[in-house]
Amino acid sequence: MIDTFHYPNRMGRIILLSMEEVMGRNGVNAVLNLSSHKTLIENYPADDSKLNFPFSTVSALGGTLEQVYGPHGGRGLATRIGRACFNYGVRQYSGQMGLT
């Protein structure tokens, strides 16, 4: 039996919102469409702690970025998206993490 691991929905939401900030809504929709995650188009996960966002989805999104934009472009976009994720997470949840 293969175990599947999941991120909290909140993390999946942060990743998708950060992608939208960097690539725009149409760019995110195109990546979601190409990675066979059409159910997430205009339907981001809830802002809660439930573990329902699979690691495999995050992996597929990264792979699709590289497929569409090439190795260098995909890596550059992934870096910018990662920075946006960090900034978004700190901005939204600094109080919960004890940051001021």
What are these regions (language model features)?
Residues 1, 10-13, 40-43, 47, ...:
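Generic, low-specificity signal for short hydrophobic/alpha-helical stretches with a mild N-terminal bias
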Residues 1-34:
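Charged, compositionally biased N-terminal leader segments and the immediate start
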Residues 3, 32-38, 83-87:
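Short, compositionally biased low-complexity segments
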Residues 10, 35, 43, 69, ...:
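Functionally constrained cores in energy, signaling, and assembly domains
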Residues 26-64:
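N-terminal interaction modules that seed assembly of large macromolecular complexes
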Residues 49-100:
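Amphipathic interaction/junction segments at domain boundaries or subunit interfaces
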